[in-house]
């Protein structure tokens, strides 16, 4: 296994602010090490005023590419030379690849969501989904689920100043994919009860339950059945209060670790041309997350 940096070592990384908490360097560097791939992946905390310079540096430094996290996914989208059709539909990018000194923007978050479901033998094709929350990760999951042939998607979002714009964005995805996507107010009790009865998959994309937060994203936990697949996009903790409660109904539960790694695996493939050793990476991450919990 390679453990030294030379003049031939390639560079990739992630840009966000804040970024010091990111698991992306561990994910990619673990994969490089397992594959003996001569590259290093770093985290770059960049201020808004410097973001465009940082994007240009991907070309200047001949980097393989860069991952983008909050709050720069839309800014990166606007600065790319080319975009995949998937990225155009979602409207933001999380991966920028340096292709012949042109920046190609893509969004692998939705692919990561689908990949995490496949690990459990779950498909969205022909299924009804309920999505709690409508942030960036949710939008990518909604878009990819529609592209993969979901039957119908119910989205529950807080009725704040972004409600109408998000609704318009999702209507665009609905038209492009010919999949019915309905956006409801987060506390629309009648709509949530109907959606849960119709749905196979229930997905939490809110931050409720993250870290030491013990709040549930759903009041109607009694409507979760054994036939449901319950997904939480949170991976810290690995088992949120939402998943613990869903387990009591004997539903299949899936945490966000798989989505995190699979979205990285697609980005890794775009940057390196290699297949990420997903099992080895997940094994390493689980050890690290348990260690952090014990600190």
Walk through the language-model features, giving the residues of each.
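NAD(P)-binding Rossmann-fold cofactor-contacting core
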Residues: 150-176
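Rossmann-like adenosine-cofactor binding region
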Residues: 179-253
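Adenosine-phosphate binding glycine-rich loop
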Residues: 229, 233-295
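Short, conserved loop/helix-junction motifs that constitute active-site signature segments
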Residues: 5-6, 124-125, 147, 218-227
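Conserved S-adenosyl-L-methionine
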Residues: 147-152, 249-252
């Amino acid at each position: 296994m390679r453990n030294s940096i030379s003049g031939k070592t390639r560079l990739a990384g992630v840009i966000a602010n804040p970024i010091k908490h990111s698991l992306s360097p561990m994910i990619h560097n673990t994969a490089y090490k397992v594959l003996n791939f001569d590259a290093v992946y770093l985290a770059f905390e960049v201020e808004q005023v410097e973001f465009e310079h940082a994007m240009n540096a991907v070309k200047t430094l001949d980097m393989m590419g860069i991952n983008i996290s909050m709050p720069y996914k839309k800014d990166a989208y606007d600065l790319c030379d080319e975009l995949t059709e998937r990225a155009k539909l979602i409207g933001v990018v999380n991966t920028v690849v340096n292709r012949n000194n042109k920046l190609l923007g893509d969004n692998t978050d939705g692919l990561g969501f689908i990949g995490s479901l496949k690990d459990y033998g779950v498909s969205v094709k022909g299924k009804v989904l309920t999505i709690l929350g409508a942030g960036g990760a949710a939008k990518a999951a909604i878009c990819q689920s529609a592209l993969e042939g979901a039957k119908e998607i119910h989205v529950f979002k807080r009725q704040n100043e972004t409600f109408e714009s998000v609704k318009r964005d999702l209507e665009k995805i609905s038209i492009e994919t010919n999949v019915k996507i309905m956006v409801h107010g987060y506390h629309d009790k009648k709509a949530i009860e109907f959606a849960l009865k119709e749905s196979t998959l229930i997905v939490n994309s809110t931050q409720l339950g993250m870290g030491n937060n013990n709040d549930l994203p759903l009041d109607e936990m009694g409507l979760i059945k054994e036939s449901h697949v319950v997904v939480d996009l949170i991976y810290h903790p690995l088992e949120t209060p939402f998943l613990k409660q869903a387990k009591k109904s004997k539903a299949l539960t899936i945490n966000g670790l798989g989505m995190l790694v699979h979205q990285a695996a697609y980005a890794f493939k775009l940057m390196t041309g290699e297949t990420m050793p997903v099992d080895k990476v997940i094994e390493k991450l689980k050890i690290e997350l348990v260690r952090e919990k014990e600190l």
